């Protein structure tokens, strides 16, 4: 069978159609590659954005955790100190239950670790009290010119009042420590000190020369210091014994426990 020769025009048309088909196919392939590249780029961009958001969340969470730790550190320190210093049934010379006065009869020695840096020339006379339900009345005797101070710390470790020789003199004084939101009448001659928190630490210190004679004189002053609820003021009062919690670590320094 004899093939017919295509005319020049037919050949040209056929070539044009072939080129057009090839061009369209190439164009389709390019479009597909471009779309795939775009999709991949968008996917990678979303992944980078998600990773950045996750990193930002982690950084924010870490920053909040650090700020929370710093913010709460005083509260935790005070609470841990209170637990250790009051975890006894009765005053034992270096610790006392809530509402009882701890009357240290000698200078703190090197083994004393309830506070970080105790004074070495004063006798501590301290108590932890709860004024969330009713005021507590603090009575101080005439110190007869002796240097003494009774800082009152709230639950944040902030000192909100400091009766003592420099601020209020050394004559006999009586104070009502009241909690947040309390209002009411106080006995005549009683000065009100408002605490920002229900927990208060009275960290009293009385100067002592360290001689046997001066120890005896300061002991007599310590014995005249008292704290009682407002409802018991002017009446016989014995504070309730403490409850001992065996789970509390009484050996490790408070600072080390808080920082652990």
Regions found by a protein language model. Name each.
Residues 2-10:
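Bacterial N-terminal signal peptides that target proteins for export
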Residues 22-25:
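Bacterial signal peptide processing site
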Residues 30-260:
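A compositional/structural signature for long, glycine/proline-rich flexible linkers
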Residues 10-18:
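Bacterial N-terminal signal peptides
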């Amino acid at each position: 069978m004899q093939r017919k020769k295509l005319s020049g025009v037919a050949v040209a048309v056929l070539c044009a159609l072939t080129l057009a088909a090839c061009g369209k196919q190439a164009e389709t392939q390019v479009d597909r590659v471009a779309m795939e590249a775009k999709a991949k780029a968008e996917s990678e961009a979303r992944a980078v954005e998600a990773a950045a958001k996750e990193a930002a969340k982690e950084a924010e969470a870490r920053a909040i955790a650090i700020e929370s730790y710093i913010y709460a550190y005083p509260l935790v320190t005070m609470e841990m100190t209170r637990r250790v210093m009051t975890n006894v049934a009765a005053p034992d010379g270096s610790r006392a239950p809530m509402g009882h006065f701890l009357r240290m009869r000698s200078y703190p020695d090197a083994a004393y670790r309830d506070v970080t840096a105790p004074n070495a020339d004063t006798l501590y006379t301290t108590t932890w009290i709860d004024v969330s339900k009713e005021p507590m009345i603090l009575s101080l005797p005439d110190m007869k010119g002796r240097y003494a101070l009774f800082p009152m710390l709230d639950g944040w470790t902030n000192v909100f009042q400091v009766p003592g020789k420099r601020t209020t003199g050394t004559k006999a004084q009586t104070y009502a420590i009241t909690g947040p939101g309390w209002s009411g009448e106080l006995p005549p001659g009683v000065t009100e000190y408002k605490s920002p928190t229900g927990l208060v630490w009275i960290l009293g210190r009385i100067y002592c020369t360290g001689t046997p004679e001066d120890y005896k004189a300061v002991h007599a002053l310590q014995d005249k210091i008292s704290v009682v609820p407002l409802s018991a003021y002017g009446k016989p009062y014995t504070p309730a014994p403490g409850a001992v919690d065996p789970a509390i670590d009484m050996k490790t320094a408070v600072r080390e426990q808080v920082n652990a």
